[in-house]
Amino acid sequence: MKRSRSINHHRCFQILLFFFLSLFAFEVAYAARPNVILCMADDLGWGDTGYNGHQVLKTPNLDAMARAGLQFNRFYAGAAVCSPTRGTCLTGRHASRFGIMTANQGHLRRGEISLAEVLGDKGYRSGHFGKWHLGTLSSDYSGKKGRNPKADYLTPGMVGFDTWFSTEFAVATWDPYDPANAHASSYDSRLLYWENGVNVADGLATGLTGCDSRIIMDKALPFIESAVADEVPFFTVIWFHAPHEPIIGGPQYLAMYPQETTNRQHYFAVVTALDEQIGRLRAKLRELNVAENTMLWFCSDNGPEGNPGAMNRRQGSAGEFRGRKRSLYEGGIRVPGILEWPAQVEAGRQTDYPAVTSDYFPTVMDVVGYDLPRDKRRPYDGLSLMTLIEKGGTQRPRAIAFAGLGMEALSGNQYKLVHNLSEKRQRSDNGKGERTEWELYDLIDDPRETTNLIAKYPDIADEMKQELQRWLKSCQASKQGADYR
């Protein structure tokens, strides 16, 4: 009898030990899961930050974020316009696969797997704040002729976001509910904010006034606070409208640039106002003691709409690079890119590793332990950046492919292949280099893309052409639905 009791006590001890070890392992796993925030500006050019060399623009918070984290010297938007890029952020796949090849058309296919859905399965709470642009938010109205309200109805809540405060497309950067500032031809509240499926019809009455970037952050921060209070890891997408048109600067920000022309004042004011909200976000993360293990990303959705010599408020700068929004030359797709993650990234790091918005999905999946190869029928264009983050390096294992708006491109570690489907120079090409059907550039020696090497290095060009054609063929299969069968 004594022996039996001893055995029972031993078994009870084993069970309790297993329970507490399992609980400890769960708590460790919970603590190890980083929060994830994807911040994105709209039409912000490579040269539109202080840390990238702008001599006038005040972006102290982005500059501080770049100093505190990993600054990408070759970070690319997934496309040269916004809707396709936004889809790459959430799916890890190029727009040629998920069906939105340009802005204001179509919707993200329902067969796609979104970052919010996967993270929801992993216990994350997900929120989207700001510009959506991946479908309509109303099933009976859209302000864009290229979208069918019923057929293209797709809200953030339909792809895994628990909370959302979003607009279908761009709104004014100041007082978006003022009819005088309407982005569309006429004012309609359905083109402004929707909150969890309900149209915010009277934003003036609910305090949605002043700086639009602040309005967005005013909604994002309570979401983060709530998740932290509930000890739930969070995934937060903050997609600003700034500095997309209508570009309207607030009085206090305009006053920061007294020596500039009115057009430059407004553009600079809008960027500085956005930067201020990045500062609020970073301060809140520190206040909540979650900054250490939060992956905070920042980028832009494409290059600048205009250029510093424009006779309007489109005063964005692509820096030294050729091209701007709508172009697959560097100025249209190379954008500011920063990752701040103190738990994994030492302050002051810079990298020349080519990275792209499609890399967000596989990188985060790598961190949370989701095995992408399980779905062998679904090609992913992005790559996990965790090896770069943990060990460094400059060589990307696979080139980045682009397509859209009459151009195709393949960008490797050194060489970039450009395919112009038309030899007519686009209005988005502000470069001085030649424009032929096929072009090859050495981005290390010639980042401005001025010297076409296609005749000098035919073997390199042919190899890249073959790789590009294989990728285009794969995308065509995806477009026809092969990935969803």
Per-region residue spans from a language model:
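Accessible peptide chain termini
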Residues: 1-2, 485
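Bacterial N-terminal signal peptides that target proteins for export
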Residues: 2-16
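Intrinsically disordered, low-complexity segments
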Residues: 2-4, 20, 33
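Short linear motifs centered on Gly/Pro in flexible linkers and helix caps
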Residues: 4-6, 23, 39, 44
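Bacterial N-terminal signal peptides
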Residues: 14-25
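Formylglycine-dependent sulfatase
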Residues: 28-439, 443, 447-485
